[in-house]
Amino acid sequence: MPEGDTVFHTAAALRAALEGKTLTRCDVRVPRYATVDLSGAVVDEVLSRGKHLFIRAGSASIHSHLKMEGAWRIGHTKVAPHRIRIVLETADTRAIGIDLGILEVLDRGTDMDAVAYLGPDLLGPDWEPRVAADNLAADPDRPLAQALLDQRVMAGVGNVYCNELCFVFGRLPTAPVGTLKDPLRVVQRARDMLWLNRSRWNRTTTGDTRNGRQLWVYGRAGEPCRRCGTLIQTDRGGERVTYWCPVCQTAS
């Protein structure tokens, strides 16, 4: 599932392509919105909120969430028609939403109601680290990975950053949140990670952008830990796959 930084720069790409332009075509391929046609409306704002995208045009707001496989593409690209959920065109460009997990057309005045449940947005103007830290610490018995992935705690952490944060703070993904010494440091580090990667596709949490050296543990099962050399372990039995170093990460 895309992380908050991916959605942030997807929004930036859509903003550059569509903002300030008049829609000449709007084809929403969702039965509920099949009759919606925003042709003639001007796209005047594109924004992200956590992992959610909003394209505002006229009195409407197109709300999408990429979920596991979704993407937005700019320009003419070859995609199987059955995968296309929406087509937006202007006089000089085209944006298509592919395999979007959520796609709905909302009233612009109330579109933020769809994301009112989210915690502080790691890449948003409303980022409040102390609120996020309090949210994280609210249930000390909760497994750390589960809490980090809960968008009500803070919006934008996906499975990559979840696993990387667990490693950086030396805790197993299953360790209770209450074992963290300083939840504020954890949410601040989460913010730093996403902020540094918000404008690039070559994500890194190690600070090394060279191929194969960008991440600490995620996707590295069976490879040596970058700190101690122990082989990275993985568990695919849960809802989300987890990765950890059995030496550098502990339960308490």
Curated annotation (Swiss-Prot):
Cofactor or coenzyme needed: Zn(2+)
Key word Nucleotide-binding present: no
Signal peptide span: none
Subunit structure: Monomer.
Phenotype upon changing E3A: Nearly wild-type lyase activity on an abasic site, does not rescue trioxsalen sensitivity of a deletion mutant, loss of glycosylase activity on 5-OH-U
PROSITE patterns: FPG_CAT (PS51068), ZF_FPG_1 (PS01242), ZF_FPG_2 (PS51066)
Protein name (record): DNA-(apurinic or apyrimidinic site) lyase Nei2
Catalysis: reaction(s): 2'-deoxyribonucleotide-(2'-deoxyribose 5'-phosphate)-2'-deoxyribonucleotide-DNA = a 3'-end 2'-deoxyribonucleotide-(2,3-dehydro-2,3-deoxyribose 5'-phosphate)-DNA + a 5'-end 5'-phospho-2'-deoxyribonucleoside-DNA + H(+)
InterPro entries attached to this UniProt entry: DNA_glyclase/AP_lyase_DNA-bd, DNA_glyclase_Znf_dom_DNA_BS, Endonuc_Nei2, FPG_cat, MutM-like_N-ter, Nei2_N, Ribosomal_uS13-like_H2TH, Znf_DNA_glyclase/AP_lyase
Cofactor note text: Binds 1 zinc ion per subunit.
